[in-house]
Amino acid sequence: LPPSVGGALANLAASFAGRTTVNLNYTAGVAGMGSAAKQAGLRTVVTSRLFLEKAKLTLPEGLEPIWLDEVAAQVSTFDRLTALALALFAPTRWIEAACGAERAPSADDVVTVIFSSGSTGEPKGVMLSHANIASNCAALDQIFHVGPREKVLGILPFFHSFGFTATIWFPATSGLGAVFHPSPIDAPAIGELVERHQISFLLATPTLLSIYMRRIAPAQFGSLRLVLAGAEKLSERLANAFEDQFGIRPLEGYGATECAPVIAASQLDFRAAGFYQPGWRRGFVGQPLPGVVCRVVDPDTFEDLPPNTPGMLLVRGPNVMKGYLGRPDLTEKALREGWYVTGDIALLDDDSFLKITDRLSRFSKIGGEMVPHGRVEEELHKAAGVSVPTFLVTALPDEKKGERLAVLTTMALDAVPSLVEKLSSSGLPNLFLPRADAFVKVDALPVLGTGKSDLRAAKQIASDKLAAR
């Protein structure tokens, strides 16, 4: 199901019933959904005929559908009033019984299995407990101080951990209102919804923010109090351009599906008579959430590193997953003495603000030196003078140096030579400079259904086009 009231209610009801939900990634196609369904042992799928028709989807074999639109048509006025009375006045155990729970769900029960995006490898089923989700929601409530009259726009898919936690459970546990729309790229509808419902909180990916900049009038975002970007790096140029256009600066958060998902988040500055506490810093993703502990260690020895020193980021807290579904081998690698090994290179400054340099998998080892793809992308965008995503860097094998850079771009290739020349005068080391013949023209940069860059697809496209060069 897409982001919708029906989809949110189905997830809530299943959880009250003591069931474990698996929100299938409908952008992964029948094969991708079938793989997830098989791994999770699914027998029943709750969906909508109208959604399947509009999305031109077919269900994987072996799944028995419950058509939510048909169920909704059978709900009487008495049913609605009864449900309202239960929601307003009944204790939780009565609601659980009404939803079909055979026993009271415990905090340690798995509430959902979310399959990782697969941007760098095969998707893995991440098992998150009620306690994992509840702790993340409680921490978000502590730093954002939401009120019952405020609303969040629910546009991130529920198969995305940020969408699941921040637009289903965070509103349900904090009293924050939620307005849903099934398509995060439907910019005209999103602008209209924010304006009509006076949305306070917008949660999106940087890719989505760049779309909204092109298609939404500044006045439509006038009610926003907080714009929080996650799932991929928010560049300084995009944050500045968004602020220039809409008058509100998007703040950056950081997380992982394995951490339910928020690990750290920028927040609004605290101001009072005689007090000022900054809530964010340029180039950083904020401070760890309450209850979450971060360590930066040497990737080889796992020894702690001093502040302001880049290294492997480890995370510990009540939000860290129970493990990977059916993969104890991967769980053992990911959880080291209770610490989740993120695979991200990061640093903590003296005030515990966290900066993510890049994923370890987004470095190329060229001639023995580590080259960060994110840094190269940032300099390419600066040299081209563009604020929307135009370049995506990947790497291909190279017989002489181990690896070489390859760049996907939506820019015309005849502009590449002058761009490379400009880049060479930017002060970047020579190993960081892609060759002019290493660029591949694409109509659009590959993006996953979660809004993150599809790194696997990028590498495959580059390999298909450049392998012979």
Predicted segments — roles?
Residues 1-28, 155-157, 370:
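Conserved AMP-binding/adenylate-forming
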Residues 16-87, 411-415:
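Structural core segment of the AMP-binding/adenylate-forming
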Residues 45, 202, 317, 322-323, ...:
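AMP-binding/adenylate-forming catalytic core of the ANL superfamily
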Residues 65-115, 122, 145-151:
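Conserved pre-ATP/AMP-binding loop-to-beta segment of ANL
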Residues 68-69, 403, 428-453:
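AMP-binding/adenylate-forming catalytic domain of the ANL superfamily
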Residues 80-84, 88-89, 199-204, 213-280, ...:
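Gly/Ser/Thr-rich phosphate-binding loop
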Residues 134-151, 159-200, 215:
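Conserved AMP-binding/adenylation subdomain of ANL enzymes
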Residues 271, 284-291, 301-333, 369-371:
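Conserved ATP/PPi-binding loop(s) of AMP-dependent carboxylate-activating enzymes
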